[in-house]
A protein has these predicted regions:
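Terminal export/targeting leaders at protein ends
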Residues: 1-104
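Juxtamembrane/start-of-transmembrane alpha-helix segments at the extracytoplasmic/lumenal side
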Residues: 105-109
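Membrane-active amphipathic alpha-helices enriched in small hydrophobic residues
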Residues: 110-129
Length: 129
C-alpha cells in the first residue's frame, strides 16, 4: 500500500526564500514535514532564523484549520509546542500551510502564532534530527 502524500504549502516570503511553494510528501506530522523540507531544500531552517531577525512569525494550519494548543501554555516554549497539535502524528493529515505573519500585525488574539526558532527547536526536541 502506498503512503498518502500530504500537501505542504509555504506562503509569502518563505516560499520565495525556499524557491518552491508546494511540497507533496509522505509525512504524518508538522515536525516531520519541516524536517523533510529542510533536508531537501537546505534552506528552510536558515530562512526561519533570518525571518526571526525580521520579526516574522508563522501561522500554521493543519487540514485548513489553525492548530490546537493548550492556551494556558506559552506557545513559544518547548512545553507549549509539545502540548500543541504541532507535536501530534495525524492519521488523516491532508495539508499543512505555513503562513508568515509580521509581528505586531495583531493576529495573536485571533490565530495561534509561533516563531520559526521555536519550530526548529521543536523538531530537535522531538528527536527528529
Amino acid at each position: 500500500m502506498k503512503d498518502k502524500l500530504v500537501s505542504i504549502k509555504l506562503h509569502g516570503v518563505l516560499a520565495d526564500q525556499i524557491g518552491r511553494d508546494i511540497w507533496k510528501l509522505s509525512v504524518s506530522s508538522v515536525g516531520e514535514a519541516l524536517r523533510a523540507i529542510d533536508a531537501q531544500s537546505k534552506k528552510l531552517f536558515s530562512s526561519f532564523i533570518q525571518n526571526d531577525k525580521d520579526n516574522i512569525k508563522y501561522r500554521v494550519l493543519i487540514n485548513n484549520k489553525d492548530f490546537l494548543y493548550d492556551e494556558s501554555q506559552d506557545l513559544n516554549t518547548e512545553e507549549g509546542v509539545r502540548s500543541s497539535e504541532l507535536a501530534m502524528n495525524h492519521k488523516n493529515l491532508e495539508s499543512i500551510d505555513i503562513v508568515p505573519v509580521i509581528e505586531g500585525a495583531d493576529f495573536k488574539d485571533v490565530f495561534a502564532i509561533v516563531t520559526g526558532i521555536v519550530l526548529i527547536a521543536f523538531c530537535f526536541a522531538l528527536g527528529l534530527f
